[in-house]
Amino acid sequence: MVNDTISDMLTRIRNASMVKKSTVLIPFTKMNQKIAQILEKEGFIQSFFLEEDSKMLVLKFKYRSKKTSNAKTKESCITNLKRISKPGLRIYTNSQDIPRVLGGAGILILSTSVGILTDREARALGVGGEILCSIW
């Protein structure tokens, strides 16, 4: 049993995108499902669905074609993922102090009283919360 399901999810996504996999299986939790919805809405993954028989989320990656001098290569839309608030050290912020990731190119995912939100949504609603992770 994994204690930190969010870190496990981010690690699985990072490892699968580094080896250019098309899909990755992630254990289903409501939190992982909400994070996957945000990743899909923000354009970091192509789609996701729940595999009923194994209780796993299947994430389909989105890749960009990158031309080099001699070939075309696939480059993941996800450059990096970083867990910020950890079980041993929780990081909280209010709505005025929510940091920007790469000048707005990346996103923060926050757990707020309204639900799981991106940094832009939290600023617009004027709510703060626990900073779960950053993605760019």
Swiss-Prot record:
GO MF term set: rRNA binding; structural constituent of ribosome
GO CC annotations, alphabetized: chloroplast; ribonucleoprotein complex; ribosome
Entry keyword set: Chloroplast, Plastid, Ribonucleoprotein, Ribosomal protein, RNA-binding, rRNA-binding
Database matches in Pfam families: Ribosomal_S8 (PF00410)
Subcellular location per the Swiss-Prot or TrEMBL entry: Plastid, Chloroplast
InterPro entries tied to this protein: Ribosomal_uS8, Ribosomal_uS8_CS, Ribosomal_uS8_sf
An example Gene Ontology biological process: translation
Gene3D superfamilies noted in UniProt: 3.30.1370.30, 3.30.1490.10
Superkingdom classification of source: Eukaryota
Subunit composition and interactions: Part of the 30S ribosomal subunit.
Known role: One of the primary rRNA binding proteins, it binds directly to 16S rRNA central domain where it helps coordinate assembly of the platform of the 30S subunit.
Sequence similarity: Belongs to the universal ribosomal protein uS8 family.
Protein name: Small ribosomal subunit protein uS8c
